């Protein structure tokens, strides 16, 4: 059987043989130089670093040399998935292939797909750190020679620069020029390493600072925020030059936007825009747009308006960008009707240009589509942004594109897709040090879990979002997390808890939720408030919701508004309003929201003693919830069906079969720990009715306490689930 690093059908060593051939070791000339110099690269100190590595004594020196060369190559990009086998084997010289065999056997390295991957970074790092500086520089010289003639000049220049022993301004200039070249090829991590090394070779302090700022920005784009901050600190950007100071402030603000307090990010970005306005209007505009993003995340509408309304030093050459700023400014000033047309131009422009647009342009189009309520266009633009970021970079935008896409799918009612993209985005954000985006992904996952019925997942993801949202001032993530908790309460019939969570978010005052989210939570609040005797608060929230819904900001809003009005109306009007709500649901997609309306309508019909009609609505609700994976809500629909006398497939057998449907509902609520008053609120009956039924439950089952009832129900339900 072939080893893990070999091609199917190839014998062990074939892959290494091809690597040696491609590195030129089979020819004369430079191969001899590599072999002689590589033997001299390491000494006793470096070999001692291998004490914990199982390796034949005859190969220890060669293995140390190989690890030194591998680590020197990794200095070029520590995030890369391995290093080029042909390059490192060629640089390591004689004995390298046998040393690689030993390293694989010891679990230190692995050769696969023409790349040498580091499995245990400790030995290689220790060797690189303990060899004398001259030997480290020699390793870089060998790597520069091995890269010569390759497709890129940057690695050759980087290793030559790393082998330099004194300030070498010309070499530093060449390295910086290569790092600045646009287009594909070097990764952001590689460009960062090149800029940082070119800074070390600079004589002028101002030039050194500029290059370190470039290195920091490339480290940020590579998903290395800690390295980026180290480089910024080395730059020491308190000099008199606006351009240098503004560049440092821009990178600092963008870093804080990724994983720091967003209020700090906003201030740094506004300072950057001011400093760069006269010398670099393009980057000044980027700073202003990032300040808008920070203000949005912190839920500060006034700060959004301020950043949007800043007058650029020069007219914006991009018409779509000007339309975006004009449209968003109108929206933030409360004029969605005015802002809709320019924002639609932004969306249409992205659709026309398609895949040729940058991820940033597509993300703006996706955001504009969300604001005007065009959810299909939002999902298309954000999906395209994700594809472009993955294909062409920058990789730092992948987690953001996934977050925007997941949120759009959540709004569109495609919860399974939203979960898949948010899970991917969470992994990506955490891997890139983007804690703020990770918090948003956690909040989205909490909302999805509140639909799918996992209260544990809701609590876990909401808590994770809030742990970052609180210190970093992420009002949007915090509002989404609180909404998810409240919706889980609703799914579990805990109306009072849901109303208590949502009341501050949808109302006025300092605890008001994020301006772009709070209206979305109003239908949940109205459902909870009307079920707990808070009709006036529900009416006030519904009046504001009606004004918002009339602007067309969300396709589900008309149906939700009719549902809210039905819950607040008298018996004469309620049926007509529920019917109107269902008609509005028919005009848009979204099984979950339609199912909620059917559930509330069916429950009301049951309480009006119209069980036959109620069953039809409740069965429709059950189908909608099951189709959308809303398991907790499906359980509510089944419970309501049982209360109508419907003998569904989930009817209990065994001891609980002696209970009536209403007694069974009360027994289950009590088993969950609900008080009589809480049960009454859930089932829309009086506490006296609950008390009456509960006495009969105790008598029928022969139990004498609520604790005993809870154990009885738990055993019976487990027996039914697992016969």
List where the protein language model places each region.
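Helix-turn-helix DNA-binding segment
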Residues: 642, 649-723
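Internal alpha-solenoid helical repeat scaffolds
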Residues: 2, 189-192, 200-440, 448, ...
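Alpha-solenoid helical repeat architecture
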Residues: 57, 73, 111-115, 151-155, ...
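Short secondary-structure boundary elements
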Residues: 1-8, 12, 16, 25, ...
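Extended alpha-helical scaffolding segments used for macromolecular assembly and cargo binding
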Residues: 117-118, 134-227, 231, 245-247, ...
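Alpha-helical repeat scaffolds
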Residues: 174-178, 226-235, 263-272, 301-315, ...
């Amino acid at each position: 059987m072939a080893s893990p690093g070999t091609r199917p059908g190839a014998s062990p060593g074939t892959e290494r043989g091809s690597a040696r051939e491609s590195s030129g070791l089979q020819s004369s000339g430079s191969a001899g130089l590599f072999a002689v110099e590589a033997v001299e690269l390491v000494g006793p100190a470096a070999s001692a670093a291998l004490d914990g590595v199982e390796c034949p004594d005859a190969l220890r020196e060669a293995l140390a040399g190989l690890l030194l060369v591998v680590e020197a190559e990794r200095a070029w990009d520590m995030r890369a998935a391995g290093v080029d086998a042909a390059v490192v084997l060629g640089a390591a010289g004689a004995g390298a292939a046998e040393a690689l065999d030993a390293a694989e056997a010891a679990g230190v390295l692995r050769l696969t797909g023409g790349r040498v991957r580091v499995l245990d970074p400790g030995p290689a790092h220790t060797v690189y750190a303990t060899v004398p500086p001259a030997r480290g520089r020699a390793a870089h010289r060998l790597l520069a020679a091995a890269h010569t003639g390759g497709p890129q000049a940057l690695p050759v220049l980087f290793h030559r620069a790393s082998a330099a022993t004194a300030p070498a301004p010309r070499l530093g200039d060449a390295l910086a020029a290569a790092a600045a070249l646009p287009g594909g090829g070097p990764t952001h991590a590689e460009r960062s390493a090149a800029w940082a090394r070119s800074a070390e070779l600079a004589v002028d302090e101002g030039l050194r600072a500029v290059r370190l700022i470039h290195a920091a920005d490339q480290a940020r784009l590579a998903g290395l925020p800690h390295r980026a901050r180290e480089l910024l600190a080395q730059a020491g950007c308190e000099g008199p030059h606006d351009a240098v100071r503004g560049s440092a402030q821009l990178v600092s603000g963008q870093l804080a936007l990724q994983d720091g307090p967003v209020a700090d990010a906003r201030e740094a970005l506004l300072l950057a825009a001011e400093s760069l306005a006269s010398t670099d209007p393009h980057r000044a505009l980027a700073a202003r747009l990032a300040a808008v993003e920070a203000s949005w995340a912190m839920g500060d509408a006034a700060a959004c308006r301020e950043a949007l309304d800043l007058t650029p030093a020069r007219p914006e050459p991009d018409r779509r960008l000007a339309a975006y700023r004009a449209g968003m400014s109108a929206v933030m000033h409360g004029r969605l009707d005015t802002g809709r047309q320019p924002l639609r131009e932004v969306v249409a422009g992205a659709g026309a240009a398609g895949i040729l647009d940058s991820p940033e342009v597509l993300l703006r189009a996706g955001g504009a589509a969300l604001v005007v309520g065009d959810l299909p266009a939002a999902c298309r633009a954000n999906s395209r942004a994700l594809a472009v970021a993955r294909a062409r970079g920058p990789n730092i935008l992948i987690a953001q594109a996934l977050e925007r896409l997941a949120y759009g799918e959540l709004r569109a009612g495609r919860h399974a897709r939203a979960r898949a993209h948010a899970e991917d985005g969470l992994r990506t954000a955490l891997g890139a040090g983007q804690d703020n985006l990770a918090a948003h992904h956690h909040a989205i996952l909490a909302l999805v879990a509140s639909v799918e019925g996992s209260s544990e997942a809701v609590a876990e993801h909401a808590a994770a979002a809030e742990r970052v949202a609180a210190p970093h001032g992420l009002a949007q993530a915090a509002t989404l997390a609180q909404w998810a908790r409240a919706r889980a309460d609703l799914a579990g019939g805990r109306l009072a808890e849901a109303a208590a969570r949502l009341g501050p978010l949808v109302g006025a005052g300092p605890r008001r939720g994020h301006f772009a989210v709070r209206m979305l939570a109003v239908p949940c609040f109205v459902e909870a408030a009307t079920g707990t005797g808070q009709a006036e608060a529900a009416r006030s929230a519904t009046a504001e919701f009606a004004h918002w819904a009339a602007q067309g900001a969300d396709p589900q809003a008309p149906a939700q508004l009719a549902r809210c009005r039905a819950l607040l109306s008298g018996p004469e009007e309620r049926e007509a309003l529920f019917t109107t709500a269902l008609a509005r649901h028919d005009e848009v997609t979204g099984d979950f929201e339609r199912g909620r309306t059917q559930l509330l309508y069916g429950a009301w019909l049951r309480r009006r003693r119209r069980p036959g009609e109620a069953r039809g609505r409740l069965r429709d609700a059950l189908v909608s919830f099951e189709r959308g994976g809303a398991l907790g809500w499906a359980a509510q629909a089944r419970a309501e069906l049982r209360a109508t006398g419907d003998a569904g497939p989930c009817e209990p057998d065994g001891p609980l079969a002696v209970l009536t449907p209403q007694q069974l509902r009360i027994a289950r609520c009590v088993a969950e720990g609900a008080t009589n008053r809480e049960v009454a609120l859930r089932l829309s009956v009086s506490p006296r009715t609950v008390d009456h039924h509960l006495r009969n439950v105790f008598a029928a089952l022969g139990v004498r306490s609520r604790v005993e009832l809870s154990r009885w129900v738990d055993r019976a339900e487990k027996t039914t689930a697992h016969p």
